[in-house]
Curated annotation (Swiss-Prot):
Top-level EC class: isomerase
Taxonomic lineage: Bacteria, Bacillati, Bacillota, Bacilli, Lactobacillales
Binding residues annotated for substrate, in chain numbering: N10, W11, K12, G174, S214, G235, G236
Family, as annotated: Belongs to the triosephosphate isomerase family.
UniProt keyword annotations, A-Z: Cytoplasm, Gluconeogenesis, Glycolysis, Isomerase
Localisation per UniProt entry: Cytoplasm
Organism: Streptococcus pyogenes serotype M4 (strain MGAS10750)
GO BP annotations listed: gluconeogenesis; glyceraldehyde-3-phosphate biosynthetic process; glycerol catabolic process; glycolytic process
The protein's name in its UniProt record: Triosephosphate isomerase
Keyword Ubl conjugation appears in the UniProt entry: no
Gene name in the database record: tpiA
Domain of life according to the entry: Bacteria
Main subcellular location: cytoplasm
Key word Isomerase present: yes
Length: 252
């Protein structure tokens, strides 16, 4: 089953609107055809309007980095998935380890968000990943499998087939440590196996699984050569236009 790769940059809490616009203008005309790869950037909420506007005539897709699971209401400081859709966003990243860790998001929250994102016609990029402690204890597969099952509970097979799963070992995010090619393949396959167990092999063959965690132009080819790695969710290397474009060289 040929799955189209997806490379997504996660800017985290970086860039003001002017910097976001300059970045999009620098990369937009240089991106490969959408027949080959989907390319997205996840911009901070304060940059979304500018980023979406700057990207609108290009193949670059735009993701929000989070949303709430209600469309409107007394939820001070939250972002409405309905409004994200109206603004023209394509994806929403949910379940990132920084959200789970610093903002105490639970698997149940992430599941509710996934449902709300689909209800508004957007596509979730659902993150999962284990700590160094869990990894060293040999419990990564079990831990990440439980995260994935919980995040996808109650979604339809069609929804699951269309979403993106991003496996990011927490010990490799922004640490300069990256998972080996074997680690990435084994864990992305484990994620796909959970989808197969919960939704059937046909759905598992369609769902795209990204690897994230210190991905850079120098190692992206190795990860993309893995049969179960369909893309990358990239932090630091997505902040500069040149390094972001260099991530796409794996196509050559």
């Amino acid at each position: 089953m040929l799955r189209k790769p997806i490379i997504a940059g996660n800017w985290k809490m970086n860039k003001n609107p002017q910097e976001a616009k300059a970045f999009v203008e620098a990369v937009a005309s240089k991106l490969p055809s959408t027949d080959l790869v989907d390319v997205a950037v996840a911009a901070p909420a304060v940059d979304l309007v500018t980023t979406i506007e700057a990207a609108k005539d290009s193949v670059l897709k735009v993701a929000a980095q989070n949303c709430y699971f209600e469309n409107t209401g007394a939820f001070t400081g939250e972002t409405s998935p309905k409004v994200l859709a109206e603004m023209g966003a394509d994806y929403v990243v949910i379940g990132h380890s920084e959200r789970r860790d610093y903002f105490h998001e639970t698997d149940e929250d992430i599941n509710k968000k996934a449902k709300a994102i689909f209800a508004n016609g957007l596509t979730p990029i659902v993150c999962c990943g284990e700590s160094l402690e869990t990894y060293e204890a040999g419990k990564a597969v079990e831990f990440v499998g439980a995260q994935v099952s919980a995040a996808l509970a109650g979604l339809s097979a069609e929804q699951v087939a269309s979403l993106v799963l991003a496996y990011e070992p927490i010990w490799a995010i922004g640490t300069g440590k990256s998972a080996t090619q074997d680690d990435a393949q084994n864990m992305c396959k484990a994620v796909r196996d959970v989808v197969a167990a919960d939704f059937g092999q046909e759905v598992a063959d369609k769902v795209r699984v990204q690897y994230g965690g210190s991905v850079k132009p120098e190692n992206v080819k190795d990860y993309m050569a893995c049969p179960d790695v369909d893309g990358a969710l990239v932090g630091g290397a997505s902040l500069e236009a040149d390094s972001f474009l260099a991530l796409l060289d794996f196509l050559n």
